[in-house]
């Protein structure tokens, strides 16, 4: 049976389903093909359920580490299985919302694996819609990414990726997390607050190595205080799953001495690579980059007419909100509607939802000076310890830091670590996107008392006149 659509979206993750909705809003007949996760990794086993677990962990942290601060008396126990059950319910609710949106926008759901026969035809295998042939005018590839692993390390029952970990309702007693990026550090926060003996091994010289160095220091201090062991500057050289226990060999960089940890479980979190295999992409003529991602232009167009790509498979910046933004550009381009390209992906915001939270975009001071050696770069940092709302919340760790051009006040980067940093960064993203200067940000009246006043104060600092510090 052959069906024809104006637009077919391959993959129902955050980029895929958003692009489908936008295309349908613009009058296109749209179908989405998905083999497993409607809402993608993000809604099912990533962003959404992990935030539920983190909230539970924050509550546990308050009762176990801050009892004296808040006058809490008596003993309270925390059940990880109950926290896990809540996270699955949260995920199910949000995924149900995706199906509702498909129906609301008259988008056809096709359940199965879409395989390209050629640049205008997809064949569905697996799933309840296996056997269908789908033709299209335009196709948006939103197939996401797959996890990397360490050389010589295979996933097994006790050596897992984030996906197996987040689906497991049982917390181990002792665990190693390989990789101190956002995912590794979020899981370390959750499990550490549920009494798991967690060790994080990171090859780079600090945790969250892609963030500002001072941000990394704040996070490292908070985690050590919480009892999480951090081993930055160490290489994981071998992982052996012995059934009842796992052995992890590691070496400090520059040393020949091998040490071994024996734990119940190991989670490997060392990044992702674009998912470009397993769906017949080679039958389309679509070109890949040297990194193995689908090559696109500013409008998400590939080199093949009528085929677009968005999200992790493009490797521009592998974040759900970036995929969503790309999806809207792709849909509007297909429909011939007015759109706005995304510009420099360096200026896209990112966050790590540990506690304190981390968020950033743009350049660090060092990066800015290296990129613009002839420009005077100014940096201002305002500590949350000087922010009244943060003091009232007893969440005074961290700071709001702004990197700017001294002459024009152009916003070149922002780096936040502290309470609700993921919410505070968006004001600065908007300002950067619309070319507001740091002076204009500082002159915008902010409600008192709020955490966002720290952002205003940092902007004042670029001009040399912070008020409350």
Curated annotation (Swiss-Prot):
Compartments (UniProt record): Cytoplasm
Cofactor dependency: FAD
Thermal profile of function: Optimum temperature is 50 degrees Celsius for the reduction of lipoate by NADH.
Record note on cofactor: Binds 1 FAD per subunit.
One of the GO biological process terms: tricarboxylic acid cycle
PROSITE patterns named among the record's database cross-references: PYRIDINE_REDOX_1
Catalytic activity: N(6)-[(R)-dihydrolipoyl]-L-lysyl-[protein] + NAD(+) = N(6)-[(R)-lipoyl]-L-lysyl-[protein] + NADH + H(+)
Pfam short name (any one): Pyr_redox_dim
pH sensitivity of activity: Optimum pH is 7.0-7.5 for the reduction of lipoate by NADH.
SUPFAM superfamilies: FAD/NAD(P)-binding domain (SSF51905), FAD/NAD-linked reductases, dimerisation (C-terminal) domain (SSF55424)
GO molecular function terms attached to this record: dihydrolipoyl dehydrogenase (NADH) activity; flavin adenine dinucleotide binding
Enzyme Commission no: 1.8.1.4
SS bond partners: 42-47
Protein family according to the UniProt entry: Belongs to the class-I pyridine nucleotide-disulfide oxidoreductase family.
Record note on quaternary structure: Homodimer. Part of an unusual ODH/PDH supercomplex, consisting of AceE (E1), AceF (E2), and Lpd (E3) together with OdhA (E1+E2).
Protein name: Dihydrolipoyl dehydrogenase
Organism per entry: Corynebacterium glutamicum (strain ATCC 13032 / DSM 20300 / JCM 1318 / BCRC 11384 / CCUG 27702 / LMG 3730 / NBRC 12168 / NCIMB 10025 / NRRL B-2784 / 534)
